[in-house]
Amino acid sequence: MISYYFQGFALGAAMILPLGPQNAFVMNQGIRRQYHLMIALLCALSDLVLISAGIFGGSALLMQSPWLLALVTWGGVAFLLWYGFGALKTAMSSNLELASAEVMKQGRWKIIATMLAVTWLNPHVYLDTFVVLGSLGGQLAMEPKRWFALGTISASFLWFFGLALLAAWLAPRLRTVKAQRIINILVGVVMWLIAFQLAREGVAHMQALFN
């Protein structure tokens, strides 16, 4: 059964490594050393819920509800455009240190709300956990399925805590004005690229619904 664990771990790691809204947010919180371990835990727990739902039967709900998928997609587009705009606005600020200080004033609950948004309003999360993992893990018998799910969940916990701790460790180098400007530009551009990609997918979904 351990082979199913490592299959799940490898697949989970491959899907979580690319830079996306979750990773960017965890990295930034690590650099700021602001509730970064709490955010890593909440991201990992969110993945635990989504992965479990996808592998143990939740994928059928999403696949049978095209309107739900469309709603999640366009909600994600709107949020990613807003999030990317905020990052680019900070990067282009004439006083980046002041802009960064304003971000640091955010309270715990606002940070948690943002974390929930970057996780649960990201349609790619549902496609990864419900469609990809659900289709692969759903074909397995119950015992291998549990090991497969445990492997993917382990990859999520290891990645988010590793990313948060590494970003916090590198914080002295990554908190410079130049580094912060580069990071915010990178995050903003990536968020907008993902948003435009999702918008194209959303248009395709809407055309399929009305045809």
From Swiss-Prot:
A GO molecular-function annotation: L-arginine transmembrane transporter activity
Function: Involved in the export of arginine. Important to control the intracellular level of arginine and the correct balance between arginine and lysine.
Membrane topology value: Multi-pass membrane protein
Family in the record: Belongs to the LysE/ArgO transporter (TC 2.A.75) family.
Subcellular location per the Swiss-Prot or TrEMBL entry: Cell inner membrane
PANTHER family the UniProt entry points to: ARGININE EXPORTER PROTEIN ARGO, ARGININE EXPORTER PROTEIN ARGO-RELATED
A single cellular component GO annotation: plasma membrane
Name of the protein this chain belongs to: Arginine exporter protein ArgO
Keywords: Amino-acid transport, Cell inner membrane, Cell membrane, Membrane, Transmembrane, Transmembrane helix, Transport
TM segment ranges: 1-21, 37-57, 68-88, 111-131, 147-167, 179-199
Location, primary (coarse class): membrane
Pfam families: LysE
Keyword Transport attached: yes
Catalytic activity: L-arginine(in) = L-arginine(out)
Top-level division of the source organism's lineage: Bacteria
